[in-house]
UniProtKB/Swiss-Prot annotation:
Entry-linked HAMAP family: MurQ
Keyword Kinase applies: no
One of the Pfam families matching this protein, by short name: GKRP_SIS_N
Misc. comment: A lyase-type mechanism (elimination/hydration) is suggested for the cleavage of the lactyl ether bond of MurNAc 6-phosphate, with the formation of an alpha,beta-unsaturated aldehyde intermediate with (E)-stereochemistry, followed by the syn addition of water to give product.
Biological function: Specifically catalyzes the cleavage of the D-lactyl ether substituent of MurNAc 6-phosphate, producing GlcNAc 6-phosphate and D-lactate.
Species, as recorded: Lactiplantibacillus plantarum (strain ATCC BAA-793 / NCIMB 8826 / WCFS1)
Family, per entry: Belongs to the GCKR-like family. MurNAc-6-P etherase subfamily.
SUPFAM superfamilies: SIS domain
GO molecular function: carbohydrate derivative binding; carbon-oxygen lyase activity; ether hydrolase activity
Name of the molecule in the record: N-acetylmuramic acid 6-phosphate etherase 1
Length: 300
C-alpha cells in the first residue's frame, strides 16, 4: 500500500520546484501562481461529471433530502467550510448541507491520529446522522483512497443514497465506490505531497459548483441574486436592500420600505413589488411556488 501511495500524482515531485529551498521569495510566488493557473484547466474535462453530480444533489433536495460532505484532513475541512457557507448565503437550515470530517469537530484544527484510516468510522458518522435514501453523500479525498471516505460511500450506497466522489488523481479508488465519480488532476504540488495547495484549491472550486448550482436549481436565486440570504449583520442588510433595488428597479428608500414591510425577506419584497400584491399575498404565492420567485410571479 505504501508504494501505491507513492505512485499517486498528488504525492509526486514537481520538477519545476526541485530547487524550491534555493529560490527567491518572488520566484516561489511566481511559480505557485503559475501552478495555480493549472487548477481550473484540470476541472474543465470533468464538467459533465460535475453536472451529473449536481443533478443528483438537486433530486435529493427536492425530496427533502440533505447534502453530506465527507472527508479527512484538508478535504474534510473544505467540506465543512462549504456547508457552513450555505446557511448565510442561501438561507438554508444547518441540517440541509453538512460537512463531516474524520475525527469529528476537533479535527478542524488539530490532526486526529488514525481517524481517516478506519472505514467503519465513516459509516458510523452517517448512521449517527440517520442517513436516508433521499440524501446525497459526497466523498472527498485528494488522494482518492481515504478509508474513512470509502466506508462512508459504501454505507450510503447500501442505504440507497446518491453517492458522489471527488478525487485529485486519475483512476482513484473512491471512484469505484460512487455513482458519479469526479477526478480532477491539477498535478504534483510545488511542495511535494502538500495537497492543501492545488488539490485543495481544485476541490474547493468543485464544491463551489456543487453547492451553488444546486441552490440555483431549487430556487434560491433570482436572476443572479442570492435572494434567500439571511440578513444577519449590517453588511447583509445593505446587500439585501440593494438586491431589492436591482430586482425591481425601485429607489433605495422604496427598497428599504419594502424590506421592512416584507419582514426583512428579500423574496417576499420582490414579489410584493413586481406582482403588486400585499405581504400576505406575496408570502402565499411563494409558498405555492415552493419558494421560486419566477414561479411565484407567474401565479394569479
Amino acid at each position: 500500500m505504501k508504494s501505491d501511495i507513492n505512485q499517486l500524482t498528488t504525492e509526486g515531485r514537481n520538477p519545476a520546484s526541485n530547487d524550491l529551498d534555493e529560490m527567491s521569495i518572488l520566484a516561489i510566488a511566481q511559480l505557485m501562481n503559475q501552478e495555480d493557473a493549472k487548477v481550473s484547466q484540470s476541472i474543465t474535462p470533468e464538467l459533465p461529471q460535475i453536472a451529473a453530480a449536481i443533478a443528483l444533489i438537486v433530486t435529493a433536495f427536492k425530496a427533502n433530502g440533505r447534502l453530506i460532505y465527507m472527508g479527512a484532513g484538508t478535504s474534510g475541512r473544505l467540506g465543512v467550510l462549504d456547508a457552513a457557507e450555505c446557511v448565510p448565503t442561501f438561507g438554508t437550515e444547518p441540517e440541509m448541507v453538512q460537512g463531516l470530517i474524520a475525527g469529528g469537530a476537533q479535527a478542524m484544527t488539530v490532526a486526529v491520529e488514525g481517524a481517516e484510516d478506519n472505514p467503519n468510522l465513516g459509516a458510523q458518522d452517517l448512521k449517527d446522522l440517520a442517513l436516508t435514501a433521499n440524501d446525497a453523500v459526497v466523498g472527498l479525498a485528494a488522494s482518492g483512497r481515504t478509508p474513512y471516505v470509502i466506508g462512508a460511500l459504501d454505507y450510503a450506497q447500501k442505504i440507497g443514497a446518491a453517492t458522489i466522489s471527488l478525487a485529485c488523481n486519475n483512476q482513484a479508488l473512491i471512484s469505484q465506490h460512487a455513482r458519479v465519480a469526479i477526478e480532477v488532476t491539477p498535478g504534483p504540488e510545488v511542495l511535494a505531497g502538500s495537497t492543501r495547495l492545488k488539490a485543495g484549491t481544485a476541490e474547493k472550486m468543485v464544491l463551489n459548483m456543487l453547492s451553488t448550482i444546486s441552490m440555483v436549481k431549487i430556487g434560491k436565486v433570482y436572476h443572479n441574486l442570492m435572494v434567500d440570504v439571511k440578513p444577519t449583520n449590517e453588511k447583509l442588510v445593505i446587500r439585501a436592500k440593494h438586491m431589492i433595488e436591482l430586482a425591481t428597479g425601485v429607489s433605495a428608500d422604496e427598497a428599504s420600505e419594502l424590506f421592512a414591510a416584507a419582514h426583512q425577506n428579500v423574496k417576499t419584497a420582490i414579489v410584493m413589488d413586481l406582482a403588486g400584491v400585499s405581504v400576505s399575498d406575496a408570502e402565499q404565492r411563494l409558498q405555492r411556488a415552493h419558494g421560486v420567485v419566477r414561479d411565484a410571479l407567474a401565479l394569479q
